[in-house]
Amino acid sequence: MPSNFFIPDPEGQVPSAEGYFGAFGGKFIPEALVAAVDEVAVEYDKAKSDPEFARELDDLLVHYTGRPSALTEVPRFAAEAGGARIFLKREDLNHTGSHKINNVLGQALLTKRMGKTRVIAETGAGQHGVATATACALFGLDCTIYMGEIDTRRQALNVARMRMLGAEVIAVKSGSRTLKDAINEAFRDWVANVDRTHYLFGTVAGPHPFPAMVRDFHRVIGVEARRQLLEQAGRLPDAAIACVGGGSNAIGLFHAFIPDADVRLIGCEPAGHGVETGEHAATLTAGEPGILHGSRSYVLQDDEGQITEPYSISAGLDYPGIGPEHAYLKDSGRGEYRAVTDDAAMQALRLLSRTEGIIPAIESAHALAGALEVGRELGRDGLLVVNLSGRGDKDMDTAARYFGLYDTDAEVAADGTGAAEIEGDAK
């Protein structure tokens, strides 16, 4: 019986044998990691054709994660988007609260197949870290999570969740102290402990085979959404919309729709304070081709090729690179990418909360802001599907400060400091 949930990429839509999507991708890594990365590629190739692997992952996705995730129409929210019909793919309802669990369970099974006993991971908003710590608790694996020091403050609740699950959380104090630097430290750890450790990479970036493998574990999002839209709306959408940081939730939604030429694929990047200010993380909007974290893609860099520091109110989108398949979709014209400011995202977060009773993650709110814009362009005949990639519990301190929801300035934040002392915007 074919798998219901683990559906590797269809023939003809895979990267080259060297891991390239057109001019983007590849494997640019130190010699010390070549054997480990190649082992992941070989083991994944075996797993893709192993019915037992598919059966085990399917069982976890159904009975542990709670798939299929719901497809929810949001008419009161859509009324602010010119009346276009808008459906949300509810990855926020998954166990651990985001799409991240899809990839994590797949890679955790691979870790066991490879005989590794320790997992490391990077995390920005903490959702990938929480999902990784969850899977390690489930499978009895040692777990170390690297997280930028600024992000540990912004996402103190998720730090506590990871530690409750038994993970060691290391606050990275180098560089910008955000996601980019957490990835750097995780790679250093992997080099030093490669024999017993698997790096459970959390997005569709990094060296081959990670971009294609992580995408395959997330393809279930779009496969389900496509089927659900045909059942609930009677047709395919005019556009599939998702936020884009590294790009995993977006490619998970987009990929099932790539053969459907009439379905626009729209990624919403973090414009921060505005692309023109330089304080943003809109890599496809303002970046140039370069190499970062083991692959060639678009990168935010200066005239000398040095990586510039990204900024976003969203810890999960605060990254100066992008998955190579997104770079390929952009250059081929199949994908469209728009930049969404902090303010537009936060206004969309509040609007969904107050019209539909759903509090989204700030990451997902960037996609919601994009949907409002696209809906107004399409009008009442438009049909949109938006990937609601995560829930907003983790972002309540940021949102409360942004909108002035605390009763006094002396309110205590999740990490025990005064709310005004925590880094990030207040409004």
UniProtKB/Swiss-Prot annotation:
Pfam families linked: PALP
Gene (name only): trpB
Pathway assigned in UniProt: Amino-acid biosynthesis; L-tryptophan biosynthesis; L-tryptophan from chorismate: step 5/5
A Gene Ontology molecular function term of the record: tryptophan synthase activity
Family the UniProt entry places it in: Belongs to the TrpB family.
Protein name: Tryptophan synthase beta chain
Cross-referenced SUPFAM superfamilies: Tryptophan synthase beta subunit-like PLP-dependent enzymes
One of the record's GO cellular component terms: cytoplasm
GO BP annotations listed: L-tryptophan biosynthetic process
